């Protein structure tokens, strides 16, 4: 089950990341998958889904859909290329938007 979710997540990540263009040198594809993954993870974690769904989606699909390593690499490349503003903006946007997404998902389920 986890492997099936991993295949789905990796395929979705490639599809989305390759179609979302950079915005002001910010790798918006990675930001998009991390934000969507954070929201879906929060929705499933804070709801009462069966354990099998959690394994398939949270561990399998979202584990391969979201990507911290790509975020770290792309952020490092911004710094290496001397794009200091984009470097800091990328870090800020990834962390803050993903936390905001989790917070909104949590609040939506609590209403």
Curated annotation (Swiss-Prot):
Na(+) is not transported, but it plays an essential structural role and its presence is essential for fluoride channel function. The chain crosses the membrane at residues 26-46, 53-73, 91-111. GO terms for biological process: cellular detoxification of fluoride; fluoride transmembrane transport. GO terms for molecular function: fluoride channel activity; fluoride transmembrane transporter activity; metal ion binding. Coiled coil: none annotated. Its main location: membrane. Keywords: Cell membrane, Ion channel, Ion transport, Membrane, Metal-binding, Sodium, Transmembrane, Transmembrane helix, Transport. It is a multi-pass membrane protein. It comes from the Archaea. Pfam families: CRCB. InterPro entries: FluC. Na(+) binds at residues 63, 66. Fluoride-specific ion channel. Important for reducing fluoride concentration in the cell, thus reducing its toxicity. Belongs to the fluoride channel Fluc/FEX (TC 1.A.43) family. This is Fluoride-specific ion channel FluC 3. The gene is fluC3.
């Amino acid at each position: 089950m986890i492997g099936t979710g991993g295949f789905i997540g990796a395929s979705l990540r490639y599809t989305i990341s390759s179609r979302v263009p950079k915005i002001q040198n910010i790798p918006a594809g990675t930001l998009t998958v991390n934000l969507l993954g954070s929201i879906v993870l929060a929705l499933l974690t804070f709801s009462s889904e069966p354990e099998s769904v959690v394994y398939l989606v949270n561990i399998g699909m979202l584990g391969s859909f979201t990507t911290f390593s790509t975020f770290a690499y792309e952020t490092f490349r911004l710094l290496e290329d001397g794009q200091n503003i984009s470097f800091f903006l990328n870090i800020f946007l990834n962390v803050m938007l993903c936390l905001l997404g989790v917070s909104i998902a949590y609040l939506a389920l609590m209403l």
